[in-house]
Amino acid sequence: MSEQFTRREFLQSACITMGALAVSTSGVDRAFASSSLPINTSGIPSCDVLIIGSGAAGLRAAVAARKKDPSLNVIVVSKVMPTRSATTMAEGGINGVIDFSEGDSFALHAYDTVKGGDFLVDQDTAMKFAEHAGEAIHELDYIGMPFSRDKNGKVDKRYAGGASKIRCNFSADKTGHILTHTCLDDALKNGVKFLMDHQLLDIGVDNGRCEGVVLRDIRTGTIAPVRAKSVVLATGGYTRVFWNRTSTPYIATGDGAASAMRAGVAFKDPEMLQFHPTGVCHGGVLITEAARGEGGILLNNQGERFMKNYAKKMELAPRDIVSRSIETEIREGRAFGKGMEAYVLLDVTHLGKEKIMRNLPQIRHIGLLFENMDLVEKPIAIRPTAHYSMGGIDVMGLESMSTAIPGLFAAGEAACVSIHGANRLGGNSLCDTVVTGKIAGTNAASFASSAGFGSGTHLHDLTLKWMSRFKEVANGKGEVNEMYAIREELGAVNWDNMGVFRTESRLVALEDKHNELQARYDALRIPNTNPVFNTAFTEYVELGNILLASRAARMGAEARKESRGSHYREDYIKRDDANFLKHSMVTMDSNGKLHLGWKDVVVTQFKIEERKY
C-alpha cells in the first residue's frame, strides 16, 4: 500500500492542513483558522491537546485543558460548527442540586439516577456525578449562561421524568442551544482554536499509547495525520443507527466509538439506546420532556389519559416506560393512524398561551414548522423516537475519563462511564457533557504537559490506508443511490428488530441482515471522484461507522437475555440481576471480528430493588 504514495505526496497531504483556511487577524476568525495546527520537525501537523467534537462536552474539555495549562495548544476538531452540534437540540434542562431547602440532596440525585438507569449504573460514579452536577450549574451561571429565573431571581427549575425532587434547571425550552453558545463564548475567550469541516477517520496508537488521529478535510478532501500528545473524543452518540427514526442530528454516527473500537477500546453497553416518548410523528424531531414537566398529558384515540394505566407518575415516569406505553397503545389499536404513521397526542392546551410562550416557545415553533399546527390551540401528534446512546466508549472512571489507551480520553455522549445505565433520566445529559467534558479536558492537559509526541509510524500507515481507500472507493463506477439504499435499509431493520421491543428471533435475523448490508457496503463504490466537498465519501465513512455500531448493539442486545431499562426483551420480560447486573463489553480484533465480554456493575450504597414509579 505504501508504495502507491511518495513521501512528497504524503507530506503534501499532511501539510495542507496548514493552509486550509485563510488566516484572519480578527479574534473569532483566527480561532476558527486551521493554521492553528503547527508543523513539527517531522513535517506532520501537531498540537498538545486535540479534541474531536464541538458540542458542550468538547467545548468544556477545551476550556478545562486551557485553564489547566495555558501554555498548551488546544484544538477542537469538528465536522460542523459548534452551533450545529447535538447539544443545541437539547431543550428541557440540566440537572443539578443547587437548592437544598426542599429536601433535595446529592445522594437523592444519585439514587434517582441509579434507579432511573434500572440499576445498571455504577453507583460510585453516580454519587460523584451528582456532586459535580451542582458545581457545574454554579459554574455555568458564573460564566454567563442566561438561565430562566424564578420570582426571587434564582435559577428556575422544573420537574423531569424519574426525578423525586425538582432539580432540572432550565433556560425556557432552549437550554441546550443557550448552553452551547455560552460554552463557545467561553472557549473563544480562553484561546481555544477550532478546525471546522474535518472528519475523524481513525486513531493512531504507538507502543500502546495514543499518538494522534487521521483527519479528512471535507472541503478539500485532503487526508492527513495530526499528532497529539493527548486526544479527547467528544463525538456524541450513535442513534443514527435508526437513521430517520431519531431526534439527533445527521452527524450522530458513532464516529468516536467506531474509531475507538478499531484502536482497541471496548464499546460498553452498546445495546442501551434510549427511545424518547415524544418525537414529532413525521420525522422524529423532539418535543421536549419539559412539555410533560410543565403539565402536558398524553391521550389515545379514546381521549383517555392512558399513562394512568402504566405508572403512578404517569407522564413523568422514566422515558423507557413512557415509550413502551405509547407503543403498546399503538399495537393494541388505541392510537390514531396506522403503521409508521400511527401516533398518540400530546396535549398542552390547558397550560394556556402565556405559560407556553414563556416556558415552551420552541416546541410551539416545532409544531408549526413540522406539523403545521399550533399546540396552543390543539394537541400535537407524537410517537417514540431514538434519542440517546447510554452505551459508548469505555472509560476507566469519572475522575479520569481516560480509556484503556494512555493519552486517549472520552467525554459526553460518546463516553460510557456508566452514569446512565440502561436508561438516562431527562436533564442528566447536558449535565453529563459539562461534567465529563471538564474532567476529560483537565486530565488530557495533565497528560500532555508531561508527555512527548509518538513516533507517528502508525499514523503514517493509517493515513496511507485511507488515501488508498478513497482512490478505491471514489472511482466513479458506483451506482448513484446504492449507499443511500443501504443506509435506509439499515435504519429500518434496526428499528423493526432492535427498537422499543426486541426478541431473540428478531435479533438473530438482524445479524443476517447486518452481514448482508456489510457485504454490500464493502463492495460499495462512489460515482464522484472529485475529492473537493465529496459529501458522498463523508457519508460513506459515516455509514461504515453506524454499521459497526449496529453490529455491536445487536450483539449486546441478543446476549442480554433480560429486560432492563430501554432494553426490553418480549421473550425475557423480567430483569435478571443474578446473570445480567453487568455491563456488556464489545471489542473488535485485528480481523474486524467482534467479541463480547462482561464487566460487573459497581454497587456501593443503594440497594438493588424492583424499579417502580
Curated annotation (Swiss-Prot):
Effect seen on changing A86H: Leads to covalent attachment of FAD to the enzyme. Is still not able to catalyze succinate oxidation
Family the entry assigns: Belongs to the FAD-dependent oxidoreductase 2 family. FRD/SDH subfamily.
Organism, scientific name: Wolinella succinogenes (strain ATCC 29543 / DSM 1740 / CCUG 13145 / JCM 31913 / LMG 7466 / NCTC 11488 / FDC 602W)
Catalytic activity annotation: 8-methylmenaquinone-6 + succinate = 8-methylmenaquinol-6 + fumarate
Places the protein is found: Periplasm; Cell membrane
Post-translational modification remark: Predicted to be exported by the Tat system. The position of the signal peptide cleavage has not been experimentally proven.
Record's signal peptide: 1-33
Record's protein name: 8-methylmenaquinol:fumarate reductase flavoprotein subunit
Lineage per the UniProt record: Bacteria, Pseudomonadati, Campylobacterota, Epsilonproteobacteria, Campylobacterales
EC numbers on record: 1.3.5.-
Active site positions: R319
Binding-site residues, substrate: H276, T288, H387, R424
